[in-house]
Each structure stands twice: as C-alpha cells, then as structure tokens.
Amino acid sequence: MLKTTDIREWIVSLGIAEDEHVYMGKLDNKQQKSIGVYSRSSSGPPNVALGGLDYTSYDVRPISLLVHWNRSKPESEAAAYELFETIRNVSSLDIGDTHINYIRLMVPEPQDVGTDDNGVYEYVIWLDFIYQRK
C-alpha cells in the first residue's frame, strides 16, 4: 500500500520546500513556501484483474499537491513549475518500500487557483501514482 505519509516524505526529498513546510491533510496556519499533500477522490471501477486481487499486480493512488508559496506571482509560479518538472522527469522511483511503476500527471501544467485570503499564490498539481501491489 502506498501511504500519504510516504508520498509526503518523497516530496520533502525533492528539496523544493523545507521538511516542516510539507503537510498532509489540512494546512492549518499555512506558512509561506509550503506544499500540501492530499488524497484525491476518483471515480470509476477499481483495478482488479481476472481472478481477483491475488492476480492484480498494481493499484492507483490519486494525489493532489497544493503549492502555497508567497505573495509574488512569478516566484510562486516558478516553484510550482519546478515541482511539476521534477515529477515529470522522474525515471525510476520507489517510495518507502513500494515500487512506483508510473506517475501519471493529470493536468498539463500546474493549475493556478489564485490566492488565499492573505494574498499568497497557490497552484495545484493532480497526479496518480501507479504502484506495485504486494
């Protein structure tokens, strides 16, 4: 199973935001230059091979990343694109003890969602981790 906590640790390892600025779940008292890691709901049937789960080799974990940066649009956009490009260029990946077969970016670029109540620019990146079941 691919856990949100493990994905959070991987995002920290990319070096775009400091460890204490990468969150899971709710971003309370959001600090600038932060990245939020959220589970994302999806629709459709589950991935189950003929014969059941014993024959199913992979599963999908939908994730949403919120880049909550600062009051500078250019700097916030640059941070969001740095994260996006870093993810897009991954060539091999294990998160925790789970092998990732494929990262499917679900948006063509970071999505500008405007600013929060304090004028901090935010971007969203949706992605699916297709991972090896155990």
Kindly label every feature range from the protein language model.
Residues 1-53, 90-94:
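Small/polar-rich, solvent-exposed N-terminal microdomains that initiate assembly or binding
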Residues 23-25, 38-39, 66, 106, ...:
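Residues in well-ordered beta-strands of folded domains
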Residues 46-47, 71, 133-134:
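Short, cysteine-centered beta-strand-loop-beta hairpins and adjacent loop/turn segments enriched
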Residues 52-57, 116-118:
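Short, solvent-exposed beta-strand/turn "edge" segments of beta-rich domains on protein surfaces
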Residues 55-61, 100-103:
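A short glycine/small-residue-enriched secondary-structure motif
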Residues 57-71, 121-131:
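Oligomerization/assembly interface segments of phage tail-like spikes and tubes
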Residues 69-91:
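Mid-chain, well-packed structural core segment of small domains
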Residues 88-133:
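Acidic-leaning, charged glycine-interspersed low-complexity segments
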